[in-house]
């Protein structure tokens, strides 16, 4: 397998060319200017799915899919001098067993006290982030509260049949995680 990569403004760009015996076509590798300004980052869709309840362990299991948008021609590059500039996703208190997957290239994930952060660059376009976790609960009901770092355009909440879901006074507010 052959690939082409380049580093521009401290950001790695690359393209896989596959198995090639002869190259006759022009190869184009798109690179972008970079910025630590997160104004162009948004969450186009967030789907929160309550998948099951383990009543013996008092744990609710959740699967989430977030579509991250970078609506610019500039790669978002967190400022290394400002740790809070990384993309952060808040999770409910008492979360356990966090697993994360994404189509973001060359990133790592770090668990923080209130959720997790993405260590890496966000290239222009839409990217998917899938994560699952459990929430330990101590009462007969669980109060599920989330905060977002970025504008959220569309929210879907899905519940498995055995879970009673109430959205009393549902209100969305964008807050820093």
Model region roles, listed by residue range:
Residues 1-177:
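Lumenal/extracellular ectodomains and adaptor appendage modules
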């Amino acid at each position: 397998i052959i690939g082409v990569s380049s580093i521009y403004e401290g950001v790695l760009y690359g393209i896989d060319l596959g198995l090639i015996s002869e190259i006759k076509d022009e190869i184009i590798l798109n690179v972008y200017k970079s910025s630590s300004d997160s104004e162009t980052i948004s969450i186009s869709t967030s789907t929160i799915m309550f998948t099951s309840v383990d009543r013996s362990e008092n744990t609710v299991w959740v699967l989430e899919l977030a579509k991250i948008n970078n609506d610019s021609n500039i790669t978002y590059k967190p400022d290394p001098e400002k740790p809070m500039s990384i993309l952060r996703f808040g999770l409910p208190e008492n979360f356990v067993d966090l697993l994360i997957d994404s189509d973001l290239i060359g990133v790592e994930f770090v668990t923080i006290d209130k959720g997790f952060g993405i260590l890496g660059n966000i290239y222009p376009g839409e990217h998917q982030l899938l994560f699952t976790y459990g929430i330990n609960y101590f009462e007969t009901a669980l109060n599920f509260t989330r905060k977002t770092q970025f504008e959220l355009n569309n929210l879907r909440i899905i519940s498995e049949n055995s879970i009673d879901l109430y959205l009393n006074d549902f209100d969305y507010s964008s807050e820093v995680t």
